[in-house]
Amino acid sequence: MIRVASYNIRKAIGTDRARRPERTLEVLNELDADVIALQEADRRFGGRASALPLKLIAEHSDYKPVPFDARPASLGWHGNALLVRKHVEVLEHHLFHLPSLEPRGAVLADVALGGARLRVVGMHLDLSGLWRRRQAQAILAHLKERDGDWPCVLMGDLNEWSTRGGCLRDFAAGHLFAPCGRSFHASRPITQLDQIMVSPDLEILRSGAHASPIARRASDHLPVWADLRIGDARAELPRPHPRLRTRLRHSLERGARRALNLDR
């Protein structure tokens, strides 16, 4: 089993408006995940310093940051960061720009976990619905261009208030959504802005929003999590011919569009 999580930490500023990175780290330790995607992990101005001191992470958790090295003092890229367990091997990592009116990006890492290779993408999408869809399409296009067809997890704050429309339509064409539940506002959750989406070769065992007393105070978002298992078919069956994979993908996309009533 693999546990993944996503958390918009709001630069370690809680609902009490106090910046307490040690409180944020306590929530991360509560999650007990193998991989965590963070949003708003860096300060907004100046050198974009990490909101979580690297020494604090190293000394008081079992996590290490994926070394994107975007800026010397930053934890991630445009506020997006990935944390993995210290024993997890990071095989590759990559960052990329997203189309937007203000600087936005996404981060990607391939990790060795659970005896398999897992691809993880972290994101924080725009407040504008138009730009959210463009960013979702850019992420999906980037994944198609990458080498390797590994089990994939996409996580982040999508800023999507719709339960079925908007950028969710784009991601639904080839991914399954973990039913994590409402994550915003942390003090009284009314909607699920934070999503975990997985490729069909991953089985979602359990999922939820982590609503411990400290998590309700540490940020304006609750972290979301999912327990996953790589499907048996993925492990046992030979990889299909590329043409067959294309046909299967197109079939999945048509089925997802029909399910969401997206055919025009």
Region annotations inferred by a language model:
Residues 44-47, 74-76:
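Short active-site-adjacent helix-start/loop capping segments
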